[in-house]
């Protein structure tokens, strides 16, 4: 299989067919584009969502929390708690766990989440630490109805394309970035984390609006998922997809496509009252821009000046590609080093 998330085709063929026979208590739609699950009991509707990250920097954990909790908030579910599972390399030490827990505690305090369970272990098959977060909440309005969006419904981007991935690249490869960029640029980029949209902020959206968090695969994957989930076609003004200049420059440095870069903390919003929604978002201090509208047909088109093209199926996330290429580069360096040692000993 390709690097990163399995394709929609594989998921439908190998996952969906297997689980359709059960799930009698679940009213959530089991679909590739869905990032949360719902279980109905006699008293309450429980909803949960999971997100995983991998990387050497302890700060990665906060992005998993933002993603998992944000997916609940996008469904108008207030996240209340998280459980955590961490896989370490066998060579890891206790300080790495302490660093992750410190950052986890900070982000959970900031977002009002309880930490209910933490499991950590090391294994010989782990190449870099993997953190999985499961967030849970209770649906406050279990009678929410699926809405059919009419042509002309506006699509708003709240947040910045590829910002999460940009921040994670700084965490993982600051030494590399310092070969090109000044310390002030690096510090300014780190402060961009304040532009990430948090779950509590998403819950402030008006009742009629529908939101969906971008994530793995970037804003283009988010648009595809939105179309799949809401059964809509649309026209998107590609030039309106907001990017931080720091994202542009860092993606250029690593030769990455920012529109395919993981974007947790940014949301796509459907609304029939675009002007009011934009005004309320901006008044609350959230970066937001109108990027397109729903069309009567199912076509998903991207317009960039005079060029119009159809939205492609989601591609692998650029951060996953970066990690893969980095690993291959390190392996090549190791082989060159081994060959040099062998040559010197002959």
What does each of the following model-derived ranges do?
Residues 1-346:
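Helix-biased detector of long, well-ordered alpha-helical tracts
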């Amino acid at each position: 299989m390709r690097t990163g998330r399995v394709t929609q085709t594989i998921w439908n063929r190998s996952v969906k067919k297997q689980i359709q026979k059960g799930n009698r208590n679940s009213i959530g739609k089991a679909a590739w584009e869905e990032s949360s699950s719902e279980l109905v009991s006699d008293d309450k509707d429980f909803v949960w969502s999971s997100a995983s990250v991998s990387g050497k920097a302890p700060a990665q954990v906060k992005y998993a929390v933002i993603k998992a909790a944000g997916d609940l908030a996008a469904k108008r579910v207030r996240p209340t708690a998280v459980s955590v599972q961490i896989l370490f390399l066998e060579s890891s030490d206790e300080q790495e766990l302490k660093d992750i827990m410190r950052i986890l505690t900070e982000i959970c305090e900031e977002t009002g989440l309880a930490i209910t369970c933490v499991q950590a272990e090391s294994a010989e098959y782990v190449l870099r630490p993997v953190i999985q977060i499961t967030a849970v909440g209770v649906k406050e309005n279990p009678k929410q109805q699926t809405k059919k969006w009419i042509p002309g419904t506006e699509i708003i981007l709240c947040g910045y394309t590829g910002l999460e991935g940009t921040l994670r690249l700084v965490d993982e490869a600051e030494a590399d970035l310092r070969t090109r960029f000044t310390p002030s640029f690096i510090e300014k980029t780190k402060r961009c984390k304040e532009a990430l949209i948090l779950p509590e902020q998403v819950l402030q959206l008006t009742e009629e609006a529908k939101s969906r968090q971008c994530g793995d695969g970037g804003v283009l994957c988010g648009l595809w998922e939105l179309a799949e989930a809401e059964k809509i076609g649309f026209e998107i003004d590609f030039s309106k997809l907001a990017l931080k200049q720091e994202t542009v420059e860092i993606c250029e440095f690593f030769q990455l496509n920012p529109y395919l870069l993981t974007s947790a903390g940014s949301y796509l919003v459907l609304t029939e009252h675009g002007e009011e929604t934009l005004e309320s978002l901006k008044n609350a201090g959230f970066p937001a821009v109108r990027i397109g509208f729903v069309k009567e047909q199912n076509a998903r088109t991207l317009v960039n000046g005079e060029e119009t093209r159809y939205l492609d199926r989601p591609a692998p996330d650029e951060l996953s590609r970066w990690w893969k290429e980095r690993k291959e580069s390190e392996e090549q360096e190791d082989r060159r080093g081994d060959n040099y040692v062998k040559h010197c000993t002959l």
